[in-house]
Swiss-Prot record:
Pathway: Protein modification; protein lipoylation via endogenous pathway; protein N(6)-(lipoyl)lysine from octanoyl-[acyl-carrier-protein]. Pfam families: LplA-B_cat. The keyword Acyltransferase applies. Belongs to the octanoyltransferase LipL family. Its EC number is 2.3.1.204. GO terms for biological process: lipoate biosynthetic process; protein modification process. It catalyses: N(6)-octanoyl-L-lysyl-[glycine-cleavage complex H protein] + L-lysyl-[lipoyl-carrier protein] = N(6)-octanoyl-L-lysyl-[lipoyl-carrier protein] + L-lysyl-[glycine-cleavage complex H protein]. This is Octanoyl-[GcvH]:protein N-octanoyltransferase. It comes from Kyrpidia tusciae (strain DSM 2912 / NBRC 15312 / T2) (Bacillus tusciae). The gene is lipL. The active site is at C148 (acyl-thioester intermediate).
Length: 288
């Protein structure tokens, strides 16, 4: 079993954290928008937050995906193969959501001497620890042809298992700042996903928007396809991730585990839901 280190992450930087093991219902759009709602709360002085959540089936794309499609002309698609298409605020490229996919989000105040690498390590270390407990060694790396490819993919046995992205908003979250900001990092872990089906969905989207089919099914894998992973499911991975975090935090760090965001965050998520529509993102107004 691989042992992971925590000293090179941000987990000890703040004395209090919030762990959201989300159970409250919501639309696809509201669940996506809740990441930014958490950012608003953290920027205003709320505790840094780690969120574990699952969404209904859809494809979630980045603003970059929308812009690239606009360059070819035509309206951005709102669905592909019957799956809704929605837009997130962080970077990267398209990823599938659904009952076999674990979403994990990290929101911390924007502070001095915090870098992108630290943020990615902080986001992924709990998941990396869970995989290590199950005998799978995960590491960062690019995998050509994988979904949402980047240097901070989580890779097991040469295949991508999780994609990540980041978004930095506002200025430093310090007293007196007029534009207190936050850092949002997001991960998508394939727990029970058919790589062939997922690649078809992603390629159908990209064929409509950029005229290409860049995703290779064999570049990525799912936990249930790894040796010893046959019976794994998302609920198990959520529970194990929460337990890993609670065990890893020393006495100097308080981790508050909750099952829901605040009412204010839920309200902000509803307000921000319309901002996930591809055509609203493309044109700045609602379009049919």
């Amino acid at each position: 079993m691989k042992q992971v280190e925590w000293d090179d992450t941000l987990w000890s930087r703040w004395p209090t954290w919030r762990l959201v093991v989300e159970e409250q219902p919501g639309t696809i759009e509201e669940k996506i928008a809740r990441d930014q709602a958490m950012g608003r709360r953290v920027a205003a002085g709320g505790p840094p937050t780690f969120r574990l959540w699952v969404n209904d089936p859809c494809l979630v794309v980045s603003r970059r995906d929308i812009v690239q499609g606009l360059r070819r002309g035509g309206d951005p698609p709102r669905e592909v193969d019957g799956l809704p298409i929605r837009v997130r605020s962080s970077g990267g490229t398209a990823v599938p959501h659904g009952p076999g996919v674990l979403q994990f989000s990290l929101v911390v105040p924007r502070m001095d001497r915090v870098g992108m690498e630290e943020v990615y390590r902080t986001l992924c270390r709990p998941v990396e620890a869970v995989l290590g407990q199950r005998g799978w060694r995960a590491e960062f790396g690019r995998v050509a042809g994988s979904f949402c490819d980047g240097a901070h993919n989580l890779v097991v046995n040469g295949r991508k298992i999780a994609g990540t992205s980041q978004s930095w908003k506002g200025g430093l979250a310090v007293p007196g700042s007029r534009n207190r900001g936050y850092i949002l990092a997001h991960g998508t872990l394939w727990v029970r996903v058919d790589p062939e089906q997922a690649a078809d969905w992603l390629n159908d989207f990209y064929e409509q928007t950029i005229g290409e089919r860049p995703i290779r099914a064999r570049a990525s894998t799912s936990l249930h396809l790894l040796p010893g992973g046959e019976g794994v499911d998302v609920r198990q991975v959520i529970a194990e991730t929460a337990n890993v975090l609670e065990s890893a935090m020393g006495p100097q760090v308080k981790l508050e585990r909750v099952r829901a965001l605040t009412d204010e965050e839920i309200s902000w998520g509803r307000e921000g839901a319309s901002e996930t529509d591809p055509r609203r993102v493309a044109y700045g107004v609602d379009r049919p």
